[in-house]
Amino acid sequence: MKRIYSIFFFLVLLSASIRAQDTLPAWQKGWMDIHTIAVGAGECTFVIMPDGTTMMIDAGDVTKASKDPHNYPNFMDDPNRTVGERIAEYVLDFSKDLPRPAGPDYFLLTHFHGDHMGQVKGMLPGANGYGLSGITQVGEYLSFGKFVDRGWPDYDEPSRERVESFNKGFMPEYRKFL
């Protein structure tokens, strides 16, 4: 029993030195930071490369796709804030001291699913002629250098109909945004 108490005491002391809420140190030249942004309703990764070049990979939003709030626990603190706002706020916070603080140098869209780019369900009206969800909403807050996706400018591989079927209704919004 004494041994169990000793082990327990050791683990308590060890855990005191581990703090999950510590802020990440600022990026430094030569470092590579890879941030998976946990917005709870889609995929988004922000990369700061050793030379300060930045890239965002995907910016999805499927907030309205599920009625179960347990699927998106990160929205419990303020359900009025959107995925786009959360992503932009995070990126701007970590970009303050970078060569291009207003937004990533590159945006890479891996594929045309809602959890990677946004979707019609839950889309907000935009003032620039396209709906806001996922990447189109993030683009309201951040300035991007170059976009990379599969299919620009025709989006016809394997066929236009097939590409449109990947994310019904949102591809026209994405094209207008670009």
Indicate residue ranges for each PLM-predicted region.
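Positively charged n-region of N-terminal signal peptides that target proteins for export
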Residues: 1-4
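Alpha-helical transmembrane segments and their juxtamembrane interfaces
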Residues: 12-13, 68, 121
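Short active-site segment of divalent metal-dependent hydrolases/proteases
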Residues: 114
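Bacterial N-terminal signal peptides
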Residues: 6-15
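Ser/Thr-glycine-rich phosphate-binding loops at phosphate-binding pockets of nucleotides
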Residues: 110-111
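Zn-dependent metallo-beta-lactamase
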Residues: 19-56, 60-77
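Flexible, acidic/histidine-containing loops and adjacent segments that form or flank the divalent-metal
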Residues: 21-33, 39, 79, 90-106, ...
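Mature, Sec-exported extracytoplasmic domains of Gram-positive
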Residues: 48-50, 60, 83-86, 90, ...
